[in-house]
Amino acid sequence: MITDARVLQPEFIPREVQHRDAEVNYLSSVLNPLTKGERADSALLYGPSGVGKTCIAQFLVEQLRGEVVALNYQYVNCWEDHSRFQTLYRLLDGIGKTVDIHRQSTPTDVHLNRLRTADDTSYVVILDEVDQLEDKSLLYDLYRIPHITMILIANDEEDLFASLDQRLNSRLTDCERIHFDPYHENELIPILHDRVHWGLEEDVISDSHLQLIAANAGGDARVVIGILRHSARTARETGSDQITADLIEEVTPEAKSEIKQRTVDRFTPHQELLYNIITEHGEISPQDLYDAYCTRTDDPKTKRMVRN
């Protein structure tokens, strides 16, 4: 049933990207100076979850690495590495400069200086979920390092810029902005075809059943891949050689729940507290949410941070 399980994971970088030609071409043109040894402009990729932002950023950088010998690259998920120290540590790790870094005692200024004084090889930094950075002044510091090119990824452009101070806003105002719309249902089917071709045995699922998966996904590529993965696993575990419509309908809620749980599992304690309050109350106004939040923590964040 499953010939390559990696292909069924959301983190898998495909060999080609479907139905994102305009976005791929735009970002490729932004990054083109790197092929000449020059710094590229910063880029912001924004749009809802599951529309291919992360996939395309990584896909294009991997292609660049095949063309440019002297190119360093690091991907950072700022939801997981949200503190200034964590982000800088990951960036230093990307160029092999963490050998004598001590998590408890090394000042972050030392990390930043080490990035500045590293060799001048072009360094592409993808900061995913960048709005989750606790200290966004780090973006200003990275912007000022000549050999670093930043690709920022966020869900909402306005929310991101509203959270930046004036100094940083002025620096990033001219960054190249690329908007990603949700996939249409018929655009998700070629994505599924590729995953089936690369990761499953032949003839285990029909085109009509791929259409059913796409119809259940709400324009989210993560969901179609999740449903396909759960369907293939369940078919294998039950000894079936086909993925049926009944099986797809059965696993769809579980696949969607898994994606939601992955998000919840990455919450910081403050985000988890906010999530629990919203879950308890259902609909709740921003002010009531903040008031309830403040009563449950001894160290509340500002209203702006809570809103973000």
UniProtKB/Swiss-Prot annotation:
GO terms for biological process: DNA replication. Belongs to the CDC6/cdc18 family. SMART domains: AAA (SM00382). This is ORC1-type DNA replication protein 1. Pfam families: AAA_22, Cdc6_lid. One of its GO terms (molecular function) is ATP binding. PANTHER family: CELL DIVISION CONTROL PROTEIN 6-RELATED (PTHR10763), ORC1-TYPE DNA REPLICATION PROTEIN (PTHR10763:SF22). Keywords: ATP-binding, DNA replication, Nucleotide-binding, Plasmid. The keyword Nucleotide-binding applies. InterPro entries: AAA+_ATPase, AAA_22, Cdc6_lid, ORC1/CDC6, Orc1/Cdc6_arc, P-loop_NTPase. Transmembrane segments: none annotated. Involved in regulation of DNA replication. ATP binds at V51, G52, K53, T54, C55, Y183, R195. Disruption phenotype: Not essential for normal growth.
